[in-house]
Amino acid sequence: MPASFADTTFTDPSRIRNFCIIAHIDHGKSTLADRMLQLTGVVEERAMRAQYLDRMDIERERGITIKAQNVRLPWRVDDTDYVMHLIDTPGHVDFTYEVSRALEACEGAILLVDAAQGIEAQTLANLYLALDKDLTIIPVLNKIDLPAADPDRYAAELAHIVGCEPSDVLRVSGKTGVGVPELLDEVIRQVPPPVGDADAPARAMIFDSVYDTYRGVVTYVRVVDGKLTPREKIKMMSTGATHELLEIGIVSPEPKPTDGLGVGEVGYLITGVKDVRQSKVGDTVTAARNGAAEPLTGYREPRPMVYSGLYPVDGSDYPDLRDALEKLQLNDAALSYTPETSVALGFGFRCGFLGLLHMEITRERLQREFDLDLISTAPNVVYRVEMEDGTEHVVTNPSYWPEGKVRKVFEPVVKCTIISPSEFIGSIMELCQSRRGELGGMDYLSETRVELRYTLPMAEIIFDFFDSLKSRTRGYASLDYEESGEQESQLVKVDILLQGEAVDAFSAIVHKDAAQAYGHKMTTKLRELIPRQQFEVPIQAAIGSKIIARENIRAIRKDVLAKCYGGDISRKRKLLEKQKEGKKRMKTIGRVDVPQEAFVAALSSDAQADKPKDKK
C-alpha cells in the first residue's frame, strides 16, 4: 500500500516535495486540489465533496479560499514513493501576507491560469512573490474542457511572463481530471526537494493557525531544520512564550497524530493554547532547551489598513458583539478592535481590517454565525496629523480629528496594478485620475491586454473603487494593490450639523477639493431621510466653523385657525402670533431625534447609491 509510506513521518527529504497553487479567484484552484486528493487516494470517493479544503460556509458560498490549508499526498513515480505537501493559498489581495508565508513553506508553485480568461492582476502579484522566494514555477492552464477556452493564446501569454516555451505549459482540467496525473509527475520532477540540517536545533515556520473549539489552537508548520517530537517543550521566537507540545501530526486531509516531524515536512502542532495571537503566522517555532538562536526571516505583524465602526442595531446586543469579535479574533490574528461610543449610534467597536474583502467577510460572519444586526460606519484609513505646536496625532476615526491649527496631514498610499483589455485604457485612466492617482507605468502583456501601474491614496480605493473599475471595464479588469508608505495631502474634516450640533457618525475626512461635494451630498440626503419636525431644522456641512453647504427641513404647521369660523381678524392674529412664539421657543430648546433608519440609510447608501466620483 503506497498510502502507508505517506503516513510515516521523518521521510528522507529527497523524497519530499512541497508545493502550492497560485491562482486568481475562480480559476479553479480548489477544484484542482480536489482532483489531486482523489487521484492520490487520500480521500475516498464516497467522502469526497466539492472544494474539500474550503471548510468555512462563507468560503464555499463565495467560492473563495480565506484560510490556507495543507494536505500530505502520496504519489509514485518510476517505482519510487514520494510525499507531496500541497499548501492551498488564499487568492485575494487582502490576504497577501498569508500567501507570502505559505510560499515560504514551499519549494515550488503551480501557476494556475484559467484557459478562458488568461492571467489576472492578483495572479501576477502572487507570481512575483513566488519568484522573490526563488520557487520553481510550473505554468498550467486549467479548464481546457470549456468551450470558450483558448489554450494556445494564453499558453503564449504565460510563457512570455514566466520565460519558458509555450509547449512547456501544461494543460489540465480540474473538473474532468484530464492532465492531472501528468501534472503530479511534473511536480516531482521539477520541484527541488527541501534542504535543511537534520541535526541542527529545531526550527519550524508557522504558516497558518486555526482555532478548534475542542482542542484550542491548531498551528500548521513547515519544519526547516532539526525535528519536533511530542511532549517536547517548544518556544515561539517572536514572543518568547514556551508551550508543551501535546500533539503533533500530519494533515491527510484529516489530522493524523504521528511521532514527530522531520526536515522539510509539513504538519500541525497542538499546544493547548486558546488564542491564535500566540501562534502568529510567520513566526519561528524552536525547542525550548538548546533552541535555535536565529529565527527564520520575514516575520511581520499584520497591520490593519482599513478601519470601520461596528455598532449593534439593538444596544442590548453589545455584549454579544464583544463575545463574537473575541471568537472571530481567535481565528483571525489580523482583526483588531477597540470599544468606542458614538453619540448617535451608542456603544460599539472600532475594528481594523486588512482590506475591504476582509471587512466584508468579518461583517458577514458576525451577522451569519452569531446572528447579529449591525450598522457599520463608512470605512476609513489611518491618518497622521502634525499640529502647529509640534504634537502628532494618529487618527483612525474622524471624530478624533484634533482641534486647532493643523500643519500637515499624511495619508497612506498604495501601489496599484490593474490588468485589463486594452480598449478600456481611457476610462481606467480617467477613473484613477478622478481618484487623485498618479500613473507609474504601463506595459502591454499581449496585443489585447495591458497592465497599468498607479499610485493612489488608500482612502480613495477602500470605498467603491473596485466596483467602479469593474463597471467601467464590463467586469474584465482585475486589481491588485500593496501599501507603499504615506504622502502629505490637503485633507479636511467635514462635520454635518443638525440644528447647530455636530453628529459624529456623519463626520468624514475628505480631500479639500471634494469637501464641497461631500457636504452637499450628505445634506441633501439627510433632508430626505430625517422626518419633519414642528419647527424648521437646518442641516449644515462645515469645515471647522466655515459652513460649506446647507439644507432646511421645513416645519410642519398645525392649522390653529381651524376652530375660528368667521370672527374678528385680531382673534386670528393673536392665535398666529402665539403659534409663532411657540415655534420660536421650540426652535431654541427643541432637539432633533434622528431615527435609526436614517442613520443606516445615510451610512450605507453611500456605498450603493449614486457612486459619487469624489467620495473618499
From Swiss-Prot:
Q: Which residues form the tr-type G domain?
A: 14-195
Where mainly found? membrane
Instruction: Identify its membrane topology class.
Output: Peripheral membrane protein
Gene3D superfamilies of this UniProt entry?
A: 3.30.70.240, Elongation factor 4, C-terminal domain, Elongation Factor G (Translational Gtpase), domain 3, P-loop containing nucleotide triphosphate hydrolases, Translation factors
Any idea where this protein resides? Answer: Cell membrane
Q: Name one Pfam family in it.
A: GTP_EFTU_D2
Q: Which reaction does it catalyse?
A: GTP + H2O = GDP + phosphate + H(+)
One GO MF term: GTPase activity
UniProt key word Transferase: no
Sites binding GTP sit at: 26-31, 142-145
- Biological process terms in GO annotation: positive regulation of translation
Enzymatic class: hydrolase
Q: Which UniProt keywords apply?
A: Cell membrane, GTP-binding, Hydrolase, Membrane, Nucleotide-binding, Protein biosynthesis
Quote the EC number: 3.6.5.n1
The terms describing its cellular component in GO are: plasma membrane
InterPro entries in the record = EF-4, EFG_III/V, EFG_V-like, EFTu-like_2, G_TR_CS, LepA_C_sf, LepA_CTD, LepA_IV
For the keyword GTP-binding, the answer is: yes
Q: What does this protein do?
A: Required for accurate and efficient protein synthesis under certain stress conditions. May act as a fidelity factor of the translation reaction, by catalyzing a one-codon backward translocation of tRNAs on improperly translocated ribosomes. Back-translocation proceeds from a post-translocation (POST) complex to a pre-translocation (PRE) complex, thus giving elongation factor G a second chance to translocate the tRNAs correctly. Binds to ribosomes in a GTP-dependent manner.
What PANTHER family has UniProt attached to this entry?
TRANSLATION FACTOR GUF1 HOMOLOG, CHLOROPLASTIC, TRANSLATION FACTOR GUF1-RELATED
Similarity section:
Belongs to the TRAFAC class translation factor GTPase superfamily. Classic translation factor GTPase family. LepA subfamily.
The entry's protein name is Elongation factor 4
The source organism is Nocardia farcinica (strain IFM 10152)
